[in-house]
Structure formats: C-alpha cells, structure tokens
C-alpha cells in the first residue's frame, strides 16, 4: 500500500515513521520488533581495519541498497514501489565462546552487517538488484544475501558517545531488564544488535548515536 507521504511525493523515512525502533530515548525500554527483511553480508574481524572485510561489506550493502532505490529510473519495475530514504546501517555482533560482547578483542568479532529492505522488495527484486549492481559496478556481489530476521522481544537504548563506551549503556539496559522481570536471551539465533544513526567519518565520537538492542525473555 502506498503511504500518504509517497502519494504527496515525499520520501518515506523509516527512522521517522518507526521511531520506536530507530529513535528510542537514551533510557532503556522494552520493545517487540517484528520480522523484517534485510540486505546482509556476513563476516568476521575488526571493523576498524582499513580496507578490511567489514568496510568492504558496507560497500556491498550500499551498492545493492541504492540499486533498489534508484530502480524507479530504469526498466525494472518493483510492484508497490514508493520513494524512500535508504534506512541506516545496522549490525548483529557476536564472538565464539563469549557471552555477549568483549570489546577488548575486536579481532574476534563475527558479524552480520545489514540494511533494512522496504516490504515491497521481494526476493526476486533483490536477485535482480544483485545482478544489476554486479553488471554496472563490475564488482562481485556474491557475498550479499536476502535475510529475514524476526527479532521479537528486546531491551533497547540510545547510546550517545564512542562505540568503546557501549558497555556502560549495556549495563544500564541489563539492570533495567532485570528490574522489569526479564532475562537476557542472547544465543546463536538472537544476537547483540546495533543501529548506526551517525556517520563515524563525519561525527565526533562523543556525539555518535547508536541504538543498542538485546534479545530478552520473560522470567
């Protein structure tokens, strides 16, 4: 269904339309996140490594994201398409043998880097975008996948500041979660989740805004 903003010629912005998922307060809260589809690339290693696999993955994600967004200018027609702002970069993070995240050992990170897809994008549309991006950019997009993730019940909080200070925010989230009668439920299927609202290349570390989300269960 076309949104009112799309009918008025305004680009749909997921951050503004779904504030409960993208713009929480900097105090912890409980949220139930529905199933969403993503462009995804899996990898491992330190995300700060120059020209490393993480930075390469981000390039692949945006290559597909903008191919889909700009499909309106080409011959491929996506049913139900409306103009939108490409959603922010997100990441699911874990380390083998570690409960949660050990920020002191970034080289051990394993991750799934993702960008949300609008609901109107089908797997067939995604496959077209991968082929189209590979053809136009002469780049190998074979690592990119269509991922459906049902996150469910979570505790989340807006973290403002450097990424290395995230443990303080996570501690507040866990304390709030326990006070509300919930238990942390991180597993191989339910992961530490971050949504990056700031461009770290252009924003001072103390002003970076990152949504942190952890899966939980009742009791």
Q: Each predicted region: which residue ranges?
A:
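A solvent-exposed interaction/effector surface
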Residues: 3-219
